Amino acid sequence: IIPIKEEDIIESLENLKQLQNKISSNNLTDSNKALSLAKEISGIPLIYYPWGLQAAGIRFKNSLQENAKMHAMVEDVVEASHNGIVAWENESQVFPILLQGDKDNIKTKERWKILKIYFDNSKIEYKEIFSIKGNILAKLIHLIYLLDYTSIYKAVISKIDPTPVKSIDFIKSR
């Protein structure tokens, strides 16, 4: 459990207000990070995350599945640097997304660097997303909000209505 202080909540809300103006549907320009990321996602996204940002990575996967109605995967960067890297030896429709923290452990930073070198040498396109600076609550809330919007924009770009969830309704009706 993360110990949360009142100032952590206030910082999170202040960051969220700033982000809201930048990524809302009132700003459909290239400066909208959520929209730009949605345009870049192709194939099957594989979201790599470090320790501490697992919740944001899993939430992004779930949001892409529910809103954009697309397959998505998630994996810890440590595992990606072990067994997960082997899968990249074959051609793939997978698009790696590297969800990085501003204060990742030094060993994690080394893993990111090595993974990017491998992708570059193998001519595998990838996208890096960096958390904001601040407390862990602010980072998680900021990333979740940004990536939720990304999943909605991805749905709209793909001409998919993000609101109905017929398959979930089917399961629930049984």
Give, region by region, the residue ranges found by the protein language model.
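A SIS-like phosphosugar-recognition module
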Residues: 1-174
